[in-house]
């Protein structure tokens, strides 16, 4: 399968990410472009998107910094870049199980400069 790359724009910040080869990644890819207002939860940005999905078999609340995921209870696109209020160590932890569908290609810590309410857009890279 051809590598699928996206660009995440948040204010003056543009960071690329690569989607994995999962059903969730396919659903996100087919829904692009996406946009919404950033919600901040610790070192996580999330926003509602017009996509619905259930938890996949590999869904987990344990994620890695730089993971991008879909949160089924909130129909939300999530970007993890550090500790969240649910973390028990230095790793991010989602509020509940998420479907990870990709990973940030650059420095995910740059998302710390994004404020709540900032418009986020997700587009096909290029």
Give, region by region, the residue ranges found by the protein language model.
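Well-ordered alpha/beta subsegment
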Residues: 1-3, 93-126
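Long, hydrophobic N-terminal alpha-helical segment
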Residues: 1-35
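Extended, low-hydrophobicity, polar/charged segments
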Residues: 11, 35-37, 48-54, 61, ...
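Surface loops and adjacent helix of pleckstrin homology
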Residues: 20, 82, 125
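Compact, glycine-rich, soluble single-domain proteins
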Residues: 31, 39-65, 71
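Short, basic/aromatic beta-hairpin or loop at an interaction surface
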Residues: 36-50, 88-103
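Mid-chain, well-packed structural core segment of small domains
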Residues: 58-99
């Amino acid at each position: 399968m051809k590598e699928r790359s996206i660009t995440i724009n948040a204010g003056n910040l543009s960071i690329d990410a690569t989607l994995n080869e999962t059903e969730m990644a396919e659903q996100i890819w087919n829904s692009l472009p996406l946009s919404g207002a950033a919600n901040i939860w610790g070192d996580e940005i999330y926003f509602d998107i017009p996509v619905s999905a259930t938890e996949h078999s590999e869904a987990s609340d344990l994620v890695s910094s730089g993971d991008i995921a879909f949160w089924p209870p909130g129909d939300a696109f999530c970007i993890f870049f550090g500790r969240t209020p649910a973390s028990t160590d230095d790793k991010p932890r989602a509020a509940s199980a998420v479907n990870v569908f990709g990973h940030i290609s650059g420095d995910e810590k740059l998302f710390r400069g994004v404020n709540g309410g900032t418009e986020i857009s997700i587009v096909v890279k290029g």
